[in-house]
C-alpha cells in the first residue's frame, strides 16, 4: 500500500547562486557526513547538490510533513547501490519515524538534464 508520493524539481542555477553566496556552509547544511566525500569529488558540485536537494525535498513531500524535524536535510542521506540505484539512508531519529509510521519500503528516482534536477519518491506501508 502506498503511504506517500513526492516529487521535486530544482534549477541548478538556484543552487549555483546559493553556493556563490554561502559557499561550503550551504553544502554542509544539505549533506550528511556520509555524503560529503562523494560531493568533494564531484565534477559538477551544483548539479550534485541539486539532485540531493530534490531527493530530500521529494521525501519530505512523500511523508507529508515538509522539511521539519525529524524530516530534516541533515537526517536524510542519499546513496546508491553497486549498480547506481539511489536509495535513502535515514538518521536514527528519522528511522524511528519510518518504523512508527509502518513504512516498509521506499523508492527513489533521480534525474538531471542541463539546468534541472528532478526526484520522485514513493513510500510503501
UniProtKB/Swiss-Prot annotation:
<protein>
    <recommendedName>
        <fullName>Holo-[acyl-carrier-protein] synthase</fullName>
        <ecNumber>2.7.8.7</ecNumber>
    </recommendedName>
</protein>
<keyword id="KW-0479">Metal-binding</keyword>
<comment type="function">
    <text>Transfers the 4'-phosphopantetheine moiety from coenzyme A to a Ser of acyl-carrier-protein.</text>
</comment>
<keyword id="KW-0460">Magnesium</keyword>
<feature type="binding site">
    <location>
        <position position="8"/>
    </location>
    <ligand>
        <name>Mg(2+)</name>
    </ligand>
</feature>
<dbReference type="Pfam" id="PF01648">
    <property type="entry name" value="ACPS"/>
</dbReference>
<comment type="similarity">
    <text>Belongs to the P-Pant transferase superfamily. AcpS family.</text>
</comment>
<keyword id="KW-0276">Fatty acid metabolism</keyword>
<dbReference type="GO" id="GO:0005737">
    <property type="term" value="C:cytoplasm"/>
</dbReference>
<dbReference type="GO" id="GO:0006633">
    <property type="term" value="P:fatty acid biosynthetic process"/>
</dbReference>
<dbReference type="GO" id="GO:0008897">
    <property type="term" value="F:holo-[acyl-carrier-protein] synthase activity"/>
</dbReference>
<dbReference type="GO" id="GO:0000287">
    <property type="term" value="F:magnesium ion binding"/>
</dbReference>
<dbReference type="InterPro" id="IPR002582">
    <property type="entry name" value="ACPS"/>
</dbReference>
<keyword id="KW-0275">Fatty acid biosynthesis</keyword>
<keyword id="KW-0443">Lipid metabolism</keyword>
<dbReference type="InterPro" id="IPR037143">
    <property type="entry name" value="4-PPantetheinyl_Trfase_dom_sf"/>
</dbReference>
<dbReference type="InterPro" id="IPR008278">
    <property type="entry name" value="4-PPantetheinyl_Trfase_dom"/>
</dbReference>
<feature type="binding site">
    <location>
        <position position="57"/>
    </location>
    <ligand>
        <name>Mg(2+)</name>
    </ligand>
</feature>
<dbReference type="InterPro" id="IPR004568">
    <property type="entry name" value="Ppantetheine-prot_Trfase_dom"/>
</dbReference>
<keyword id="KW-0444">Lipid biosynthesis</keyword>
<keyword id="KW-0808">Transferase</keyword>
<keyword id="KW-0963">Cytoplasm</keyword>
